[in-house]
Curated annotation (Swiss-Prot):
<comment type="function">
    <text>One of the primary rRNA binding proteins, it binds directly near the 3'-end of the 23S rRNA, where it nucleates assembly of the 50S subunit.</text>
</comment>
<dbReference type="InterPro" id="IPR019927">
    <property type="entry name" value="Ribosomal_uL3_bac/org-type"/>
</dbReference>
<feature type="region of interest" description="Disordered">
    <location>
        <begin position="117"/>
        <end position="142"/>
    </location>
</feature>
<keyword id="KW-0689">Ribosomal protein</keyword>
<dbReference type="GO" id="GO:0019843">
    <property type="term" value="F:rRNA binding"/>
</dbReference>
<dbReference type="InterPro" id="IPR000597">
    <property type="entry name" value="Ribosomal_uL3"/>
</dbReference>
<comment type="subunit">
    <text>Part of the 50S ribosomal subunit. Forms a cluster with proteins L14 and L19.</text>
</comment>
<dbReference type="GO" id="GO:0006412">
    <property type="term" value="P:translation"/>
</dbReference>
<keyword id="KW-0699">rRNA-binding</keyword>
<keyword id="KW-0694">RNA-binding</keyword>
<dbReference type="InterPro" id="IPR009000">
    <property type="entry name" value="Transl_B-barrel_sf"/>
</dbReference>
<comment type="similarity">
    <text>Belongs to the universal ribosomal protein uL3 family.</text>
</comment>
<protein>
    <recommendedName>
        <fullName>Large ribosomal subunit protein uL3</fullName>
    </recommendedName>
</protein>
<dbReference type="Pfam" id="PF00297">
    <property type="entry name" value="Ribosomal_L3"/>
</dbReference>
<dbReference type="GO" id="GO:0003735">
    <property type="term" value="F:structural constituent of ribosome"/>
</dbReference>
<dbReference type="InterPro" id="IPR019926">
    <property type="entry name" value="Ribosomal_uL3_CS"/>
</dbReference>
<dbReference type="GO" id="GO:0022625">
    <property type="term" value="C:cytosolic large ribosomal subunit"/>
</dbReference>
Length: 212
C-alpha cells in the first residue's frame, strides 16, 4: 500500500548494519503530522489526503486557515501538502480527519521517494550552472568563463543554457531505503542524502519505481 508523511531534515550521520557495513543516512523528523482533510472525487474531483506538519502560533494564521484546522481539532500548521496516490493503493485514505500520523507508518527496509527544495545558489554562470568547460586562462585568450557561441543572432530556442538562478527548486530523489525507524522520537533514517539544507521540509512517499 502507498503512503506518505511530511518531515524536516535534521542532518546526516552514519550507522552500521548487522554485517558491520557503514551506511550513511539522513535523519528526518516526522513528529506532529496530522490529517487535515480527505479530498474525494465527488467533492474535489480527485482523491488525496491533506497532511499538516509542525504547529505554529494562531497569531500567524488567518481566519480561513484557523477554520480549516479547527475541523481536525489541531493547531495551525507551517507545512501543508497533499499526499496523492491511486485510490486503491492509498493507505492514508482510511484515516479520519484529525488523526495523527507517526513514524511507525513506515518500516525498515521499505523503498521511498523523498521530495525537497534544493539549496539556492543564487545567480550563477554556465560553468557552475550547466557544467560547461572554461576557455584557456593564458595571456592573450579572450575567452575564459564566458557563455560562448549562442548560435543565430535572433530566435534562440527556449531552454538554452544561459546564466541564471541556480538551485532553490523542487527535487525528488527516488528509491531510497529506510534503514531504521525510531518510534520513540518519531524519526526516520533514510539511506543516502535527500534534497535541501538542514531544517528544510521534505515529503517522504512510497517509491513509485521499486529499486532493483
Amino acid at each position: 500500500m502507498a503512503k506518505g508523511i511530511l518531515g524536516r531534515k535534521i542532518g546526516m550521520t552514519q550507522i552500521f548494519d548487522e554485517n558491520g557495513v557503514l551506511i550513511p543516512v539522513t535523519v528526518i523528523d516526522v513528529e506532529g503530522n496530522v490529517v487535515l482533510q480527505q479530498k474525494t472525487v465527488e467533492v474535489d474531483g480527485y482523491q488525496a489526503t491533506q497532511v499538516g506538519f509542525e504547529s505554529k502560533r494562531e497569531k500567524l494564521s488567518n481566519k480561513p486557515e484557523l477554520g480549516h484546522v479547527k475541523k481536525a481539532n489541531t493547531a495551525p500548521k507551517r507545512f501543508v501538502k497533499e499526499i496523492r496516490f491511486d485510490a486503491l493503493n492509498n493507505e492514508l485514505l482510511a484515516l479520519e480527519v484529525g488523526t495523527e500520523i507517526k513514524a511507525d507508518l513506515f518500516t525498515a527496509g521499505e523503498d521511498v521517494d523523498v521530495t525537497g527544495t534544493s539549496k539556492g545558489k543564487g545567480f550563477q554562470g554556465n560553468i557552475k550552472r550547466h557544467n560547461q568547460s572554461r576557455g584557456p586562462m593564458t595571456h592573450g585568450s579572450r575567452y575564459h568563463r564566458g557563455v560562448g557561441s549562442l548560435g543565430a543572432i535572433k530566435g534562440n530556442m527556449k531552454g538554452k543554457n544561459l546564466p541564471g538562478q541556480m538551485g532553490n527548486e523542487q527535487v525528488t530523489v527516488q528509491n531510497l531505503k529506510i534503514v531504521a525507524v525510531d518510534t520513540e522520537n518519531d524519526l526516520l533514517l533514510v539511506s543516502g542524502s535527500v534534497p535541501g539544507p538542514r531544517k528544510g521540509y521534505v515529503v517522504v512517499r512510497s517509491a513509485i519505481k521499486k529499486g532493483n
